[in-house]
């Protein structure tokens, strides 16, 4: 792509409108990315336990997710902002490298033969997914005019939903629709889970490759300005210092929301880590990872995760209606309390089919977590520092996950006596606490939720990018 001759800056020159299919193509890669995340979130604890991890060790092994999110996202965001190649563009090199590494990791993961291999592959997989995902957020701001950005993030949200539903359910589909064995030899991964990861790796790479091939990026509007800005902002350490300094200079509403986010994401991480162990031991009454019952339970957890993800997309349509009738604080409080009750209710379930009812509450909470806090926060931030503070806000997603990774293992072993169902109950209590704390948040009266459904990927993301709320 030839360098432009115009001298207008990005702020003064309007980007051309893109067609529906151009927006579709630039967002299609998220289908593959979410396949990877869905397989990781619903199956890693199962793989760790199969490789011999004790119940109290699993949370610590999951620390890879928040740590890579905290480190990789700002690094890739920083580097991709300062990258330009006439042939490869700005974001596409990172799409390709991340997709290639993540796809290979997905293929290798179900073939690990030792716990240390599984733990190491999670670090590689999570880092690689973040390498691909982070620039996708910024791509919408790069290519779309402001009036089309909601459509752009809406398209990403659609592919995120489809990827989460299908990706989480893949092991169950292979076992129940295609008759693939889900009962492995001791210390090995079941064939149905292997096939799910193989398909996930293929879909990840091909979906991202489609976006790379079918999307053209614009060069910097003024190459001289671009190079000057790179020189002016050089020094990644300075960027990290500014970000961490922002924690100590947050506006009041942001401080209040940070506490809500802490308890919300602590609960979510508890669920992602321990649902498989809680369901298999408490409802299926087995801890034998080579048994048919255990693997049936593990597959069912994937179905449950697909249900809450799918339901959240539907609930997102109703959130603005409830918020306009009441308030955003009440809406978020109600959603989080329902999510907490959903998690706690799993303790009382004997028939595994009824876990789907519990997932209704979780899906409602998930829809709200991915939207309402960002809408409330947007009204409390100065417009010229929106992106900066949204990046700082991301810390209160990864920090609680890190805390959960450090303390949930000892709590499960010493307080709950190796009964992970009580760890889920703790997560439910944490989510209810987050809901009650929402009532303390100051929300500007003149800020309203949009009339159309938008998740965290869309709400205010003109300013949010490249911050990313996902693990």
PLM-predicted stretches and their roles:
Residues 1-21, 113-120, 129-132, 136, ...:
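Intracellular loop-helix junctions on the cytosolic face of multi-pass helical membrane proteins
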Residues 8-66, 255-260, 264-289:
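Helix-loop boundary and gating motifs at the non-cytosolic
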Residues 55-56, 146-156, 298, 381-393:
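Loop-to-transmembrane helix entry/capping segments in MFS-fold secondary transporters
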Residues 73-88, 314-328, 412:
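Helix-to-loop junctions at the C-terminal end of transmembrane segments
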Residues 95-114, 338-350:
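C-terminal ends and interior cores of transmembrane alpha-helices
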Residues 105-132, 354-368:
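Hydrophobic core of transmembrane alpha-helices in multi-pass small-molecule transporters
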Residues 131-144, 368-382:
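Intracellular juxtamembrane helix-capping segments at the cytosolic ends
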Residues 323, 329-373:
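C-terminal transmembrane helical hairpin of 12-TM major facilitator-type secondary transporters
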């Amino acid at each position: 792509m030839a360098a432009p001759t115009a001298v207008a800056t990005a702020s003064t020159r309007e980007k051309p409108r893109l067609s529906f299919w151009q927006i579709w193509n630039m967002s299609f890669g998220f289908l593959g990315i979410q396949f990877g995340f869905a397989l990781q979130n619903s199956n890693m604890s199962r793989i760790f336990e199969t490789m011999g991890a004790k119940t109290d060790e699993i949370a610590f092994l999951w620390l890879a997710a928040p740590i890579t999110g905290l480190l990789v996202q700002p690094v890739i965001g920083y580097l991709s902002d300062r990258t330009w190649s006439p042939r490869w563009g700005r974001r596409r090199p990172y799409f390709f490298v991340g997709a290639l590494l993540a796809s290979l990791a997905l293929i290798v993961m179900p073939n690990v033969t030792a716990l240390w291999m599984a733990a190491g592959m999670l670090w590689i997989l999570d880092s690689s997914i973040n390498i691909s995902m982070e620039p996708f957020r910024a791509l919408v701001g790069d290519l779309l005019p402001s009036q089309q950005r909601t459509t752009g993030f809406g398209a990403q949200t659609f592919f995120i939903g489809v990827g989460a539903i299908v990706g989480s359910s893949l092991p169950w589909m292979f076992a129940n629709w295609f008759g693939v064995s889900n009962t492995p030899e001791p210390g090995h991964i079941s064939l149905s889970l292997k096939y799910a990861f193989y398909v996930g790796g293929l879909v990840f790479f091909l979906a991202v490759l489609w976006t790379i091939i079918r999307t053209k990026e614009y060069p910097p509007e003024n190459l001289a300005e671009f190079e000057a800005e790179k020189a002016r902002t050089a020094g990644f350490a300075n960027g990290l210092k500014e970000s961490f300094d922002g924690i100590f200079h947050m506006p009041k509403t942001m401080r209040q929301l940070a506490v809500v986010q802490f308890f919300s994401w602590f609960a979510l991480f508890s669920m992602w880590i321990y649902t498989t162990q809680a369901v298999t031991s408490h409802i299926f009454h087995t801890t034998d990872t080579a048994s048919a019952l255990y693997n049936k339970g593990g597959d069912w957890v994937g179905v449950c995760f697909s249900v809450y993800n799918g339901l959240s997309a539907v609930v997102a349509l109703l959130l603005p209606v409830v918020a306009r009738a009441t308030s955003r604080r009440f809406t978020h409080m109600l959603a989080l309390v329902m999510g907490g009750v959903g998690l706690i209710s799993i303790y009382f379930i004997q028939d595994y089919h009824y876990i789907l009812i519990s997932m209704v509450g979780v899906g409602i909470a998930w829809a709200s977590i991915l939207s309402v806090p960002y809408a409330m926060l947007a009204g409390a931030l100065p417009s010229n520092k929106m992106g900066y503070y949204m990046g700082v806000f991301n810390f209160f997603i990864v920090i609680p996950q890190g805390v959960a990774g450090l303390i949930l293992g000892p709590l499960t072993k010493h307080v709950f006596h190796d009964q992970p169902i009580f760890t889920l109950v703790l997560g439910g209590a944490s989510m209810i606490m987050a809901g009650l704390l929402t009532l303390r948040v100051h929300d500007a009266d003149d800020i309203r939720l949009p009339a159309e459904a938008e998740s965290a990927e869309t709400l205010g993301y003109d300013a949010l990018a490249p911050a990313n709320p996902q693990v």
